[in-house]
């Protein structure tokens, strides 16, 4: 029976999985969009959603809880100072997972995970130029 099985193992030990999710969450908070494999993206979404919910609370205890999960002081600061306010009116669903084809080396399914209502200025200059060229997300 498949009772009480909540998360994917991702072929890693518990400590490796925990460290990987912390690193990926820090990268997602910093860049607001990352490319990874589909199972990792699906696992990262709820993890980051819970962190943003802590940031919306904005108290010291929430900041300490986020720090214990992310282990990156700069990203926790951005999480609480920027993202908590940005999503104050939204009840959940802070991340979006988009399928992005297959990786050439091993044909692994890839995905883009991004924050909803993300800031395009958080991306690099090359990405901004490409977005403007495609007529996609423009800065307001």
Curated annotation (Swiss-Prot):
One GO CC term on file: cytosolic large ribosomal subunit
**Which NCBIfam families does the record cross-reference, listed alphabetically?**
L17
Q: Which PROSITE patterns match?
A: RIBOSOMAL_L17
**InterPro entries tied to this protein:** Ribosomal_bL17, Ribosomal_bL17_CS, Ribosomal_bL17_sf
Instruction: Tell me the segments the record calls region Disordered.
Output: 119-140
Annotated protein name in UniProt: Large ribosomal subunit protein bL17
Q: Name one GO biological process term.
A: translation
What subunit structure does UniProt give?
Part of the 50S ribosomal subunit. Contacts protein L32.
